Amino acid sequence: MDRPIDDIVKNLLKFVVRGFYGGSFVLVLDAILFHSVLAEDDLKQLLSINKTELGPLIARLRSDRLISIHKQREYPPNSKSVERVYYYVKYPHAIDAIKWKVHQVVQRLKDDLDKNSEPNGYMCPICLTKYTQLEAVQLLNFDRTEFLCSLCDEPLVEDDSGKKNKEKQDKLNRLMDQIQPIIDSLKKIDDSRIEENTFEIALARLIPPQNQSHAAYTYNPKKGSTMFRPGDSAPLPNLMGTALGNDSSRRAGANSQATLHINITTASDEVAQRELQERQAEEKRKQNAVPEWHKQSTIGKTALGRLDNEEEFDPVVTASAMDSINPDNEPAQETSYQNNRTLTEQEMEERENEKTLNDYYAALAKKQAKLNKEEEEEEEEEEDEEEEEEEEMEDVMDDNDETARENALEDEFEDVTDTAGTAKTESNTSNDVKQESINDKTEDAVNATATASGPSANAKPNDGDDDDDDDDDEMDIEFEDV
């Protein structure tokens, strides 16, 4: 924030506190504005008041947002930790609060003035009910020749709101004249940019009180940290004669942890610094660069570790193979590849890396193919098992159908058998009856024949055997006929 604007804001706050507060409030705000930040103990010591008297003053100014507080726990040396309260002013908040208060006061007076600007003719002195002249005519009491209030039956009096409105208008004009400096300051502030005055910024502007203060005046001090005291460090030579070179600023810087770093560079220094940064970045990029065989797949594309049946000429591999073939380490015959250039160590290392990587990818491809084959075999086995289960289910269903058909046929056969048995039984019964009748007739015929042949048998005893044979033959014939 610029110096003129800073003075305007401070003068505005002083004018407001003197015009609307007065008394001890002026001392509190002036002390905080002068020192930028004040601890509670230091403020009580400067004003020579106790905490009971200071509490209401701080509460009123805080409620009106003219001052702000900051609490933090500090660790003094060789003592217990304490919680200290610091008071400072947040300029944007205070300016907004002043704008709002001025607007409320002016608006309240204008609303009251507009409400009573038109007199209504008559009013009740008791309930303050107002009536127009036409309404008052209806409330006329002929016995008393007075206008009576419809609510409390009291005589109405003439409304003198015109005089009161004039007084209120004069009061509003006097108020506007009194707050005109505030309005002018607010207009100037609105045309400028006000920075946020945080606790850290307020510490940077600190003017320490001239007493034996126990407050650290630091932001978030840690346990065991060294507290800065005035005179601990010498002033910088290049700051003499400036706003930061005065005694108060040096003491404020000594009592706060805020530091200022100044770095003066030229265009050539910036170019050199930029080139150095670019070189360092390029070196880091080279170190972190991904190898070529990681960017693209080399399976089937390079000579070493390729999966196809083609062979590529490699002098190193061929030479080692020839050495293994010649046990006596005899020099091998010269071939066409001996005329080629000798490979450098870097190229050989790259080829070895490519070969290793290709072998790895080849093994990985074989492993993947093996896994795919195993998966296909497992899928085929599962399909075969499913087909076998389906066939077993079909066989079971067919067996059940055949069993059902056999049971049905057996039931039908039993029915037919029962019917046939019944018919056979009946036929056997009829045959038995017929056979019995035939036997009866045969016995009767035999008896009759025996009766007829009885006398002759007695008369001719010698011929008995022949006659008996003839009779038996005849009976057999007759029996057969029957």
UniProtKB/Swiss-Prot annotation:
Present with 35900 molecules/cell in log phase SD medium. This is Transcription initiation factor IIE subunit alpha. Residues 9-99 form the HTH TFE/IIEalpha-type domain. Residues 321-345, 419-432 have a biased composition (Polar residues). Transmembrane segments: none annotated. Coiled coil: none annotated. Recruits TFIIH to the initiation complex and stimulates the RNA polymerase II C-terminal domain kinase and DNA-dependent ATPase activities of TFIIH. Both TFIIH and TFIIE are required for promoter clearance by RNA polymerase. Gene3D superfamilies: Zinc/RING finger domain, C3HC4 (zinc finger). It comes from Saccharomyces cerevisiae (strain ATCC 204508 / S288c) (Baker's yeast). One of its GO terms (biological process) is transcription open complex formation at RNA polymerase II promoter. Residues 274-295, 321-482 are annotated as: Disordered. Its main location: nucleus. Residues 274-286, 433-444 have a biased composition (Basic and acidic residues). GO terms for cellular component: mitochondrion; nucleus; transcription factor TFIIE complex; transcription preinitiation complex. InterPro entries: TFE, TFIIE/TFIIEa_HTH, TFIIE_asu, TFIIEa/SarR/Rpc3_HTH_dom, Znf_RING/FYVE/PHD. It holds the Pfam family TFIIE_alpha.
